[in-house]
């Protein structure tokens, strides 16, 4: 049984905030928020251990100048069910021990299920990236989005689309806010380092003459039919464009490729996951970025806004960020070979012709962390009074 008795807040008179993360995307998106909340609140950052090794998580604490988490829960189990159970159990024990005034989570990961314990302990829950919906029930994230949205006391959405989804669910409008995406703030703070990265020299790549690939989502990697379709399409892409395809390869994806025996075209270069500055430098200088990452639309919008547009193609058939399609920031291509090649052609030609789309206003806000601090400070007491009747 885990012992969190040695963990405690500073008790400096400030609001005691517990922030829970477990994956690389959460750390990246929350970086500016974590640093800002540490200025104004008494903060404990807890990592569930859901997705931890240096390349997946540790490098980002370094790149983004984040202090190491105060707590590692080591919640990974023998299988997914055990891991989810451990996350709920360990986070409950931690919260019972340290008694935070509020809990902050972001997104739709297994680590976000920690809010179940917070609800049981009557701790106000604040959820960023609330209301995202892709309407594809095959995605495990879609189920977790609904669970976390409904359990949370205050939902902070990226867009009006997301706010409408929350309203349609019947969640209280008076505790739902549109903050915008936190990614622009993180990217702005790191833009000089991104532009100064020497990753092209280190990898021997010429700017504008390579395709950057990221493919790691469960529906693309773990489903046999989709896996074969996707990587057959990638081989076709290598053959058609005859240039290096740099694949930033998640360990799970690498293991799946090795187990399958699938033979990638020699122009597809598998590389361990890249650091924040290096990956974004590669993005903004690529012939095309082909990715199933949820942040691709946000990154495309941001780099367009600062004069570094890149052709962005998403290898999915649904999106939880329709506002980015509203502004023509990326193309949904799916994983079929012909459709993917058509999408890359269109994205590259439009970029070349200056048909860049427009930045999504909610994706270029630079004060999201300020909004989050003020919402948490404003509503912790309100939730305690109106929901839990504490006073």
Task: Show which residues each predicted segment covers.
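Nucleotide-activated sugar donor-binding and catalytic core shared by glycosyltransferases
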Residues: 1-243, 253-391
């Amino acid at each position: 049984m885990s012992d969190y008795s040695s963990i405690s807040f500073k008790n400096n008179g400030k609001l005691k905030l517990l922030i829970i993360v477990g994956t690389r995307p959460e750390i990246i998106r929350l970086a500016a928020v974590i640093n800002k909340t540490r200025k104004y609140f008494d903060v404990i950052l807890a990592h569930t251990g859901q997705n931890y090794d240096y390349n997946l998580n540790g490098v980002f604490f370094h790149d983004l100048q984040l202090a190491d988490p105060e707590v590692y829960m080591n919640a990974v189990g023998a299988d997914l069910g055990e891991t989810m159970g451990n996350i709920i159990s360990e986070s409950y024990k931690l919260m019972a021990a340290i008694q935070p005034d509020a809990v902050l989570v972001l997104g739709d990961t297994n680590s976000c299920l920690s809010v179940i314990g917070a609800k049981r302990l009557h701790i106000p829950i604040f959820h960023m990236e609330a209301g995202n919906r892709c309407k594809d029930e095959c995605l495990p994230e879609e189920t977790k989005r609904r669970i976390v949205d409904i359990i949370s006391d205050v939902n902070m959405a990226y867009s009006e689309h997301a706010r409408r989804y929350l309203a349609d669910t019947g969640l209280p409008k008076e505790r739902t806010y549109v903050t915008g995406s936190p990614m622009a703030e993180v990217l702005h703070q790191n833009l000089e380092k991104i532009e100064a990265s020497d990753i092209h020299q280190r990898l021997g790549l010429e700017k504008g003459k390579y395709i950057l690939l990221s493919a790691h989502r469960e529906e693309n990697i773990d489903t046999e039919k989709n896996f074969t379709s996707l990587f057959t399409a990638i081989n076709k892409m290598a053959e058609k464009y005859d240039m290096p395809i740099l694949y930033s390869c998640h360990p799970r994806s690498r293991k799946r490729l090795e187990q399958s025996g699938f033979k990638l075209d020699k122009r597809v270069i598998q590389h361990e996951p890249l650091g924040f500055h290096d990956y974004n430098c590669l993005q903004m200088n690529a012939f095309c970025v082909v990715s199933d990452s949820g942040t691709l639309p946000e990154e495309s919008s941001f780099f367009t806004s600062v004069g570094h547009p890149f052709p962005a193609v998403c290898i999915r058939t649904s999106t939880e960020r329709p506002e980015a399609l509203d502004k023509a920031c990326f193309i949904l291509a799916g994983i079929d070979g012909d459709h993917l090649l058509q999408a890359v052609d269109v994205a590259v030609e439009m970029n070349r012709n200056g048909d860049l789309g427009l930045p999504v206003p909610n994706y270029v806000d630079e004060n999201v962390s300020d909004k989050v601090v003020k919402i948490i400070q404003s509503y912790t007491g309100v939730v305690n009074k109106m929901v839990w009747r504490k006073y």
